[in-house]
């Protein structure tokens, strides 16, 4: 199983870099993950989406799709693509330390 070292801690990840155990995630790790995805600074809106992703995963066992994010996170789909240009659901899930949402390529 692949691993990554984030914030000085070794964590188990899958072949695409998504956490195997979301409980290992910290906000400091999120900052490092965001930088690796080309996001230099996490704004309040980024954190809103990240925390929403983690809440949805905790409640439903999967991260939300872009459509669900746009309708229920308080951030529009257009804003989601501005915040996470490489793909809102996939990149936000990776930064949030949860598995890739179903339906993401």
Which residues make up each language-model segment?
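N-terminal first-folded block
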Residues: 4-37
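Gly/Ser/Thr-rich helix-start
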Residues: 18, 62, 98
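Helix-rich interaction surfaces within compact, conserved domain-sized segments
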Residues: 13, 65-105
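A short, ordered amphipathic alpha-helix with a cationic face
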Residues: 18-24, 55-58, 66-67, 79-80
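Metallocofactor- and cofactor-centric catalytic cores in central/energy metabolism, strongly enriched
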Residues: 30, 35-54, 58-59, 66, ...
């Amino acid at each position: 199983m692949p691993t990554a070292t984030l914030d000085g801690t070794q964590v188990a990840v899958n072949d695409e870099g998504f956490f195997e155990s979301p409980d290992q995630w910290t906000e400091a790790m999120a900052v490092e993950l965001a930088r690796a995805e080309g996001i230099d600074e996490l704004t309040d809106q980024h954190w809103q989406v990240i925390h929403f992703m983690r809440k949805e995963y905790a409640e439903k066992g999967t991260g939300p799709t872009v459509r669900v994010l746009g309708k229920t996170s308080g951030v529009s789909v257009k804003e989601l693509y501005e915040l996470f240009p490489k793909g809102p659901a996939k990149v936000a899930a990776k930064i949030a330390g949860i598995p890739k949402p179903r339906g993401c390529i």
